[in-house]
């Protein structure tokens, strides 16, 4: 990790926007996890610290189950369990438990700790340093629209995108964000016509970027041209709530959040499908969840089936999704990924708006 951070720092003088962004992810079963958690601490041996690199936990559901039951958690060396990196859900659980049996027999190295103790350490470091961030491996993979062509091994610097990566492909995503407070009518309601037109233009523009972009590696170019992911996000939620005279921490704010995000998703999916009619579907479309008629909101049920328990999230909708579903079934999708809520810390200042969906 220290070598990676040093490489990032070496590029900093050429990065006009500030420090070069970078983030390292580590799975919770890795034998170095306890040291990894302390990489951003301001105390201790500085040779074991990475002050200029972000860190994130990549947590499987099995760890959370063990933690809730106050059970044990086994750490392994990655070279002893090479397939765990590429497994998730029930297949991961089966393989992990088989490795635990091998470890008990002394066939491979292991170290056993209490799952609750590791979880407490994760939270302690998060409160003290803001790192490592908490991300969930199984949720990202089970709900991925591209589950037919690879595995998601991490998110990105800001945890807003989850794309497949591998030795031959480096995930790349082109991001853009709608200024929400510019899409309210004079009476404070959401201007659907304006929002639809903005998103239609933005999706086309982001798709164009894929073809004209500069790629530092062939793996990045190969991935982007094959899957064509884009990330439509939003900024200005706090400004919009202020204009509507709605407190940020209120039920009305939650309801408005559901309303505008449903609209953004609706118009973005529709725009990508219409673009597919014009330009063709992305190369790896066949076999994807889009191709199978499964939209992102449908994957909550997929995750419930995987976990064998209900997930308490609102599942109602206000818009006629049959229209979008029919278009996708007929024309397909131009982009494998469409929505991503980026932090917009810099561009929101340029636009004179509040950052993403956060209060300021």
Annotate each PLM feature.
Residues 1, 56, 60, 85, ...:
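Generic structural signal for well-ordered, non-membrane alpha-helical segments
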Residues 28-31, 203-212, 223-245:
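Core structural elements
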Residues 198-221, 247-344:
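Internal maturation/activation junctions in enzymes
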Residues 163, 185, 336, 346-360:
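Gly/Pro-rich active-site capping loops and adjacent beta-alpha segments
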Residues 137-138, 177-179, 340-343, 351-354:
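Active-site proximal loops enriched in glycine and acidic residues that flank catalytic Cys/His/Asp
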Residues 1-180, 184-192, 215-221, 268-289, ...:
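Active-site cavity-forming subdomains of large catalytic enzyme subunits
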Residues 175, 237, 345:
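Hydrophobic, well-ordered secondary-structure elements that form the walls
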Residues 38, 148-149, 229-236, 266-267, ...:
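Short glycine/threonine-rich loop-to-helix capping motif typified by GTGT followed
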């Amino acid at each position: 990790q220290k070598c990676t951070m040093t490489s990032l720092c070496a590029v900093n003088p050429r990065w006009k926007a500030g420090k070069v962004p970078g983030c390292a992810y580590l799975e919770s079963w890795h034998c170095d996890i306890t040291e990894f958690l302390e990489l951003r601490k301001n105390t201790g041996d500085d040779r074991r610290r990475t002050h200029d690199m972000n860190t994130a936990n990549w947590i499987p559901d099995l760890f959370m189950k063990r933690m809730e039951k106050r059970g044990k958690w086994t750490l392994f060396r990655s070279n002893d369990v090479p397939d765990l990196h590429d497994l998730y859900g029930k297949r991961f659980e089966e393989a992990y438990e088989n490795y635990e049996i091998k470890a008990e027999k002394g066939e491979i190295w292991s170290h056993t700790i209490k799952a609750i103790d590791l979880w407490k350490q994760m939270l302690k470091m998060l409160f003290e340093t803001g790192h490592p961030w908490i991300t969930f491996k199984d949720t990202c993979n089970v709900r991925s629209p591209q589950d037919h062509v690879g595995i998601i091994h991490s998110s990105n610097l800001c945890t807003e995108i989850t794309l497949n990566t591998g030795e031959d492909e480096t995930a790349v995503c082109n991001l853009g964000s709608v200024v929400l407070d510019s899409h309210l009518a004079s009476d404070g309601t959401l201007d659907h016509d304006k929002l639809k037109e903005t998103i239609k233009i933005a999706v086309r523009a982001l798709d164009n970027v894929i073809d004209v972009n500069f790629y530092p590696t062939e793996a990045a170019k190969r991935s982007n041209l094959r899957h064509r992911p884009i990330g439509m996000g939003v900024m200005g939620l706090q400004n919009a709530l202020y204009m509507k005279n709605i407190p940020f921490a209120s039920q009305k704010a939650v309801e408005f959040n559901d309303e505008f995000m449903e609209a953004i998703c609706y118009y973005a999916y529709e725009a990508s499908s219409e673009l597919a009619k014009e330009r063709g579907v992305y190369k790896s479309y066949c076999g994807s969840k889009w191709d199978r008629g499964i939209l992102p909101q449908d994957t909550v049920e997929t995750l419930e089936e995987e976990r064998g328990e209900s997930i308490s999230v609102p599942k109602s909708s206000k818009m006629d999704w049959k229209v979008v579903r029919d278009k996708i079934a007929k024309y397909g999708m131009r982009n494998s990924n469409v929505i991503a809520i980026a932090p917009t810390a810099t561009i929101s200042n340029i636009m004179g708006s509040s950052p993403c969906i956060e209060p300021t």
